[in-house]
A protein has these predicted regions:
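Sec-dependent bacterial lipoprotein signal peptides
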Residues: 1-19
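Intrinsic disorder/low-complexity segments enriched in polar/small residues
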Residues: 3-6, 220, 263, 304
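Secreted/periplasmic proteins
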Residues: 19-158, 162-234, 239, 245, ...
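Extracytoplasmic
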Residues: 241-307
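Conserved Rossmann-like nucleotide-binding pocket used by diverse enzymes
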Residues: 15, 236, 277
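Detector for methionine-enriched segments
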Residues: 1-3, 143, 297
Length: 307
């Protein structure tokens, strides 16, 4: 294995599917696609206008591309008065939990449960462009509900999302897949993004903790303690047992002038490894630009780290 091929394993998750509704979900790059009923299911095309079809013949890469979204263009309810979901045991959705699946050349595997899930990264939001369309679990997306899309959590599941920059948190019900834009951890509904201050900026640094409603008294994990210090945003490019490989990578990154390069020794599952990171980075836009430069060097996609 070449020295630069070490790094972190790809995350995991599921797909969408289905039929039942009246709107076709737009791709995250674009436009709604309508398909004749008989073209996929072998039924009469006369009923096609009455039924929803998620066109599975299209590659996932055409369905989920990160583009600009928009806020509501009509009256906006008072987000402060909206009620957060109460976590409860629900059956696993028949749709949206296929595992593994591939989007934009990257493979994902659906987690069996939200229990123990605790990740930090970048949150984005999706709003008006998807409002009223089917989610991956074939529910109707409501941007005024406290919901979210995850590439790895099972559908449906619950999580507490905390904005690490201001300490605000919200309980969300995960019922959709995404985001598949590089460096994103979770997509929040418009309401959830407003509740914790991700909107109007559009992105933010968050911690996502899975909720297990099967464990009485432990349904709601406490939000993390947020200090006044602004959380640091980094890109982890590799972690190596061989220190020479780590040092070579660090030198290559420094020569490319991608930003401050940090090399540190850490314990991972009882093993001592040397970690190579770029950062801290000033904001999400800078992280996206640096990530693209690193991939352009022929290196694996770096992983976002928030400390």
């Amino acid at each position: 294995m070449k020295w630069w091929q070490a790094s972190l394993a790809l995350a995991a998750l599921s797909l969408l599917a289905g039929c039942g509704g009246h709107k076709t979900k737009p791709s995250r790059g674009g436009h709604a696609t309508h398909q004749q009923d008989g073209a996929r299911a072998g039924t009469s095309s006369s009923s096609s206008s009455d039924r929803f079809h998620d066109d599975l013949s299209r590659p996932q890469s055409s369905r989920y591309r990160d583009r600009s979204d928009s806020i509501p263009d009509g009256p906006i309810p008072d987000i402060g008065k909206l009620i957060e979901p109460v976590p409860k045991v629900e059956p696993r959705s028949l749709y949206g939990n296929k595992s593994p699946y591939t989007v934009l050349g990257r493979s994902y595997k659906v987690l069996p449960t939200a229990r123990g899930y605790d990740e930090r990264g970048i949150a984005s939001f999706y709003g008006n462009k998807f409002h009223g369309y089917k989610t991956s679990s074939l529910e109707t997306y409501d941007m005024y509900a406290f919901s979210a899309a995850s590439p790895t959590l099972p559908l449906p599941s619950y999580a507490r999302v905390t904005n690490l920059e201001n300490g605000k948190s919200v309980i969300v019900r995960v019922n959709d897949r995404g985001p598949f834009h590089a460096n994103r951890l979770i997509d929040l509904s418009y309401a959830a993004a407003v509740r914790i201050g991700i909107w109007p900026k559009g992105t933010g640094l968050v911690e996502v903790r899975g909720i297990d409603p099967r464990q009485p008294g432990q349904e709601l994990p406490p939000p993390p303690v947020v200090t006044r210090r602004h959380p640091g945003l980094y890109l982890q490019v590799g972690a190596f047992a061989n220190t020479d490989n780590a040092n070579r990578l660090a030198q290559r990154l420094r020569e490319a002038n991608v930003g401050a390069v940090q090399v540190s020794d850490v314990d991972v599952n009882g093993q001592r490894v040397r970690r190579v990171r770029v950062g801290p980075l000033v904001d999400v836009d800078r992280a996206d630009a640096v990530s693209a430069r690193i991939e352009g060097m022929g290196l694996p996609r770096p992983q976002v780290a928030v400390d």
